[in-house]
Amino acid sequence: SIQTLKGGTVALIAPNVRNTGSIITPDGTTHLTSASQVTLALQDGSLTQYQVEQGVLKGLVDNGGAIIAENGAIYLTAKAKNNLSKAVVNHSGVLEANRVSTNAKGEIILLGDMAVGETHVSGTLIAEGKNGQDGGFIETSAAKINILDGTKVSTLSKQGKTGNWIIDPTDFTISAGTAITTGSGIGATTLHNGLTSTNVTLQTV
């Protein structure tokens, strides 16, 4: 278990990163990054720059635990070294970045490599608005994305505006029912269930 003070940052950087425990960064940021080179910049103890410079041949970020960043942000990133590499983001746990105060971030991003990467989602992603705040922002991106049955996504706000979930793959198939029939897609039932708790934007590049 890892917990920071308010505004703190946790950055786990390696070719393969796995989390099965809990990481709590109130008003702060958590990075789980598969890469060989990352540039960090700090000012007065706060992270001001986080740039993934170089990927790896076989990269993996695997979160089966709980990451909580109230008013903050959570980033799971896997960058490939080249087009013959592999970079995968797996999320089967809980990610929560609710907005509970004014000007809060409330952001969750799962980013596999956009050329050869894969992002697999079967867990919970919550970026809701509390105390009158708008819902947050969730993004799942990679060349291929699999949104599995049982995935829970919510950017709801009882007193504010519902937030947005962006699904951004190279290509994507919406299949009948809950099963995924291609290497990148979501079941229509799973998507329908998601639309009850978040706005969804599907964009392909």
What are these regions (language model features)?
Residues S1-V205:
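Extracellular and secretory-pathway beta-repeat/beta-biased strand scaffolds
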